[in-house]
Amino acid sequence: MAMKIGTDAFKERVSQGIDNEFMRGAVSGAQERLRTRRLEAAEELGNWEEWRSLSEEIRQHVLENLDFYLGQLAENVAKRGGHVYFAKTAEEASSYIRDVIQKKNGKKIVKSKSMVTEEINLNEVLEKEGCEVVETDLGEYILQIDDHDPPSHIVAPALHKNKEQIRDVFKERLDYQHTEKPEELVMHARAILRKKFLEADIGITGCNFAIADTGSVSLVTNEGNGRLVSTLPKTQITVMGMERIVPSFSEFEVLVSMLTRSAVGQRLTSYITALTGPKLEGEVDGPEEFHLVIVDNGRSNILGTEFQSVLQCIRCAACINVCPVYRHVGGHSYGSIYSGPIGAVLSPLLGGYDDYKELPYASSLCAACSEACPVKIPLHELLLKHRQNIVEKEGRAPISEKLAMKAFGLGASSLSLYKMGSKWAPAAMTPFTEDEKISKGPGPLKNWTQIRDFPAPHKSRFRDWFADRETSERTKEEQ
């Protein structure tokens, strides 16, 4: 699965999301639960704003010294017997991983949850080579067996499905014969996945944070699949975005606490795993061979720009969980594996404005996302910068918008035109007016007035009322 999901136009995706009542209900309920848990976890920690500032400082420091820490990480991974590959593009990353698997004659692959492997379209590349690739995160596994349904949330990828829908998928794909009880569904999936773990030749994981001074990679999970993926297969491949790095375990401790509290409202997740190279002589667990693939794929182009702060992201989805737009349209409406406010900022940077020029406008600019972000990314400000670039640098504003703004500028800068427009506006809008409201607006007002009240122009203008009042006052004074 590549970063881009679906081929429908943005407006069509949004309409589909709005029409999906179950999805909107599920998203709204999940947002409320996760928001409440996050606030409780933040209050329990205490001094939340100070923790946010510290986390921001750590991420900013890493980005400003990224060359050094990437070099240190690569050196320490190599010292411990691992292999490091820097991939400039998604194609380079996928090709390297494919070559490693072919050299090991690997055919059965298990994966833990990883957004960057979806970004580089890894599963499709490996499946074309005849490999069996199994997602072992339960949410991702559900989506995979359901015809590779795209994720709709960074942390909870199957958020858009209910237990009845999951039961039906299991019945059709896994010969499931039980009820929709979550416990029964999980036990059935667990039995299948356990066998896959034991049969796998290759394990592929993502990386929440790489620790530069030890050459370690970390996995933060609640299901334990990350440990099985990284210890049972003989060859482990970890794939990470180049910015997902911390100097030492001291900084890791801070960020992982912020990640778990912001993502799911937990002090810590059930499993926090740090892996350092292949197993040593005499060790029982762990891979015999370890590869770390560090992916650029457009990230270096963001460094040093006005958008650099977006690379501070720790993928907690706190911004998604408070976003009113996401609540109404869902994750698939964004057309990217990165949804919500972070996706609206990041997707155009990694995928370009051709595919994602609408996303910066999918925001009310309420700044709830910026307030929720544990590393203080000013997301609403970055969305505005995107809009500015789209109009001024890219020249991609719709023709209708350009004409409307030009007409407004012309009318607002000419007193005679402004007077004429305000005088004739009530008459011009009469066919669209009902009960002093525009009920069926023309042009761009049509969608607005279908679900909102838009006041009709008043028949008497303020300037006329004010002039009449002044005349009346002068008359009284003269009398």
Swiss-Prot record:
Binding site residues for [4Fe-4S] cluster 1: C313, C316, C319, C373
4Fe-4S keyword on record: yes
Domain of life: Bacteria
Chain ranges of the 4Fe-4S ferredoxin-type domain: 304-334, 353-382
GO biological process: lactate catabolic process
Residues involved in [4Fe-4S] cluster 2 binding: C323, C366, C369
Database matches in PROSITE patterns: 4FE4S_FER_1 (PS00198)
SUPFAM superfamilies, alphabetized: alpha-helical ferredoxin, NagB/RpiA/CoA transferase-like
Induction behaviour: Is under the dual control of the transcriptional repressors LutR and SinR, which allows the lutABC operon to be induced during both growth in liquid culture and biofilm formation. Is induced by L-lactate, which relieves LutR repression.
Keywords: 4Fe-4S, Electron transport, Iron, Iron-sulfur, Metal-binding, Repeat, Transport
Gene Ontology molecular function, alphabetical: 4 iron, 4 sulfur cluster binding; L-lactate dehydrogenase activity; metal ion binding
Pfam families named among the record's database cross-references: Fer4_8 (PF13183), LUD_dom (PF02589), LutB_C (PF11870)
Effect of gene knockout: Cells lacking this gene are unable to grow on minimal medium with L-lactate as the sole carbon source. Cells lacking the lutABC operon exhibit little or no defect in biofilm formation on MSgg medium, but form small colonies that almost completely lacked surface architecture when glycerol is replaced with L-lactate in the MSgg medium.
Purpose of the protein: Is essential for L-lactate degradation and allows cells to grow with lactate as the sole carbon source. Has probably a role as an electron transporter during oxidation of L-lactate. May also allow cells to utilize an alternative carbon source during biofilm formation, since it contributes to the formation of architecturally complex communities when lactate is present.
Family (UniProt): Belongs to the LutB/YkgF family.
UniProt protein name: Lactate utilization protein B
Lineage of producing organism: Bacteria, Bacillati, Bacillota, Bacilli, Bacillales
